[in-house]
Amino acid sequence: MSTTLLSPFYDIDFLCKTEKSLANLNLNNMLDKKAVGTPVAAAPSSSFTPGFLRRHSASNLHALAHPVPSPGSCSPKFPGAPNGGGSSCGPAGGGGLASYGQLKEPSGGSGTALVTKESKFRDRSFSENGERSQHLLHLQQQQKGGSGSQINSTRYKTELCRPFEESGTCKYGEKCQFAHGFHELRSLTRHPKYKTELCRTFHTIGFCPYGPRCHFIHNADERRPAPSGGGGASGDLRAFGARDALHLGFAREPRPKLHHSLSFSGFPSGHHQPPGGLESPLLLDSPTSRTPPPPSSSASSCSSSASSCSSASAASTPSGAPTCCATAAAAALLYGPGGAEDLLSPGAPCASCSSSGANNAFAFGPELSSLITPLAIQTHNFAAAAAAAYYRNQQQGLTGPAPPPAQPPAAPAPPSPPFGFQLPRRLSESPVFDAPPSPPDSLSDRDSYLSGSLSSGSLSGSESPSLDPGRRLPIFSRLSISDD
């Protein structure tokens, strides 16, 4: 046999071996992949392209194991070649029809070998054999048997068993997940802020769906010390009212009381006066103390003689003193700083409030007297000069000087000149004014000064229609006791 005939045979044999090795490589790649329906690349020289193969298809597996050679690969290229030249392609050299028939009817031996090779790469389409099922069942039984000794839950034995506490017996026995007695009770690792804040649901509607398992405070005995860096518990305590604080039994600071115990309707509210007058000087600077009450309360509870000076005193006072005690400012204008200090002694309310029996929370203390004293010093000279000038004009208008009456409020008020009542009105309208120099005889006669100031006050236009001229006001009755 010549070398020209051997070289084609050698090429054909090499090509067939290469195709077999490629087919085996593709089969291993397909078995390693887990996804069903993965496309498998066939041999580039083979005419059979399976496409998307099902992994549980035995015929496809056998087709990959025995690929179909191309018709030209096994046919003799040279006419001089013997018929045995095609037999060098292996068992498929018998013809394409025989190989194609093997795709549909695989032999039992080759199919069993392929399934055995693939047993370690089981897919969902293959049913599990008996050995694997028994192994899984054995593992499940071991897990169930060891559940009594293993603690799977973090709350194991952290709560008492309710049936055991009630009846003394438990049907689960030693396998019970709850503690049968305090000796089995374990401490559970809690959050650092556990039981440090109030339960909003429980303290709002009175019911909590979590019950004793709630992580927030329901009762006072459940409270735990708050962590060092957290101040949320104190903020939550302030968020609730006095009813919740009394229910929990916590010590709570008293709420600051307002200055104005008189409501806008003029009636006293139900606040009680604490002993000692004002609670603190800081209350004078609170926003609520700067709101003056309506003028209706001044007309109902204050005297007509002091109402002309009440608006000026309330406007120039920094704390906005209530107008129900405007007689104190009038006394400061009449008697100077000494009279104001006597009237504004601690625990001495005004006569109108004391006669009505109201528990007024606004009690005059040293702080208020110190605030009103500069007002009395500023307005004392001007009021004295105005009263003296009015009294001189009154005596000049009459035929003879009338003696001052024994009781100044009971004296009838004579008609006054036009300028007699303009000065007090200017005093009531402008809170800031300049005091003119006082005449030397303005403080010579105290009774005449008192009568003149009272007469000017009665003609200032603020006299109430129900005032009896023959009846003395309560504030002047108390002040005249020392004179008599």
UniProtKB/Swiss-Prot annotation:
Matches recorded under Pfam families: Tis11B_N (PF04553), zf-CCCH (PF00642)
Induction statement: Up-regulated in response to fibroblast growth factor FGF4 in embryonic stem cells (ESCs) in a p38 MAPK-dependent manner (at protein level). Up-regulated by glucocorticoid agonists, such as dexamethasone (DEX), in burst-forming unit-erythroid (BFU-E) progenitors in a receptor NR3C1-dependent manner. Down-regulated during erythroid cell differentiation. Down-regulated during the conversion from quiescence to activated satellite cells upon muscle injury.
Post-translational modification: Phosphorylated by RPS6KA1 at Ser-480 and Ser-482 upon phorbol 12-myristate 13-acetate (PMA) treatment; this phosphorylation results in dissociation of the CCR4-NOT-deadenylase complex and induces p38 MAPK-mediated stabilization of the low-density lipoprotein (LDL) receptor (LDLR) mRNA. Phosphorylation occurs during early preadipocyte differentiation.
Superkingdom, natural source: Eukaryota
Biased composition (Pro residues): 401-418
Compositional bias per record (Basic and acidic residues), positions renumbered to this chain: 117-134
Keyword Nuclease among record annotations: no
Region entry Disordered, spans: 100-152, 261-304, 395-484
UniProt keyword annotations, A-Z: Cytoplasm, Developmental protein, Metal-binding, Nucleus, Phosphoprotein, Repeat, Ribonucleoprotein, RNA-binding, Zinc, Zinc-finger
GO function term, MF aspect, one: mRNA 3'-UTR AU-rich region binding
Record region (RNA-binding): 172-213
Name used for this protein in its record: mRNA decay activator protein ZFP36L2
Organism field: Mus musculus (Mouse)
Lineage: Eukaryota, Metazoa, Chordata, Craniata, Vertebrata
The gene coding this protein: Zfp36l2
